[in-house]
């Protein structure tokens, strides 16, 4: 009996290890924009580095949530991750507006 229980537990645990997580990642930017191209590269790298155990599906152009709804969707746990214009939340915290200061970065890699 003990061997049977151990066997069932081993099979159940093996199924958990092989489980695949799927995340939806909304963006307010259109599919052909620089921002979404970066997100696609990120999703591809996550897929590769996790051995396919985490799949991220992009939803550009407000196809899952409108741009002004995305931040709230993350806050309420409706999606695990998202991309949105951080400076749009500068009224909540002035630091969120740093990315909209012109000429702060001198290059893409800066």
Q: Where are the predicted features?
A:
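Positively charged n-region of N-terminal signal peptides that target proteins for export
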Residues: 1-4
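Hydrophobic helical h-region of N-terminal Sec-dependent signal peptides
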Residues: 6-13
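N-terminal signal peptide c-region/cleavage motif recognized by signal peptidases
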Residues: 14-18
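Short, glycine-/small- and polar/acidic-enriched structural segments
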Residues: 22-24, 29-110
């Amino acid at each position: 009996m003990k061997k049977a229980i151990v066997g069932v537990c081993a099979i159940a645990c093996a199924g958990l290890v092989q489980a695949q997580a799927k995340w939806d990642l909304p963006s307010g930017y259109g599919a052909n924009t620089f921002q979404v191209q970066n997100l696609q590269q990120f999703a591809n790298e996550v897929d590769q580095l996790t051995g396919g155990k985490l799949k991220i599906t992009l939803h550009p152009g407000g196809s899952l949530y409108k741009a002004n709804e995305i931040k709230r969707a993350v806050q309420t746990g409706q999606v695990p991750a998202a991309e949105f214009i951080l400076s749009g939340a500068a009224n909540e915290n002035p630091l969120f507006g740093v990315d909209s200061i012109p000429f702060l970065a001198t290059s893409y890699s800066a």
